[in-house]
Amino acid sequence: MELKNSISDYTEAEFVQLLKEIEKENVAATDDVLDVLLEHFVKITEHPDGTDLIYYPSDNRDDSPEGIVKEIKEWRAANGKPGFKQG
């Protein structure tokens, strides 16, 4: 999977794919790829909860990739940050 420079370079569907790739790497034999993906996730989302969005979701949120995207989208909009690429 190609990692993009900014969250604005991802469509929502592409970001869901990134989250699914993270899920897949969670069960890999090593964490080498997972570490890179998680660092990228934290960097481009800029969300203060970081990887807790994935591993420790709030009780009132869907913990699916789509639920994570929804929370990121809402937080970025509320904080005046650019959103996902339209596509």
From Swiss-Prot:
Pfam families given in the database record: Colicin_Pyocin
InterPro entries: Colicin_E_sf (IPR035900), Colicin_pyocin (IPR000290)
Gene3D superfamilies: Colicin E immunity protein
Annotated GO biological process: bacteriocin immunity
UniProt KW rRNA-binding keyword: no
Molecular-function GO term, any one: toxic substance binding
Nucleus keyword on record: no
Keywords per UniProt: Bacteriocin immunity, Plasmid
Domain of life, per lineage: Bacteria
CDD domains in UniProt: Col_Im_like
Family (UniProt): Belongs to the colicins ColE2/ColE8/ColE9 and pyocins S1/S2 family.
Stated role: This protein is able to protect a cell, which harbors the plasmid ColE7 encoding colicin E7, against colicin E7, it binds specifically to the DNase-type colicin and inhibits its bactericidal activity. Dimeric ImmE7 may possess a RNase activity that cleaves its own mRNA at a specific site and thus autoregulates translational expression of the downstream ceiE7 gene as well as degradation of the upstream ceaE7 mRNA.
Listed name of the protein: Colicin-E7 immunity protein
Species this chain originates from: Escherichia coli
Higher taxonomy: Bacteria, Pseudomonadati, Pseudomonadota, Gammaproteobacteria, Enterobacterales
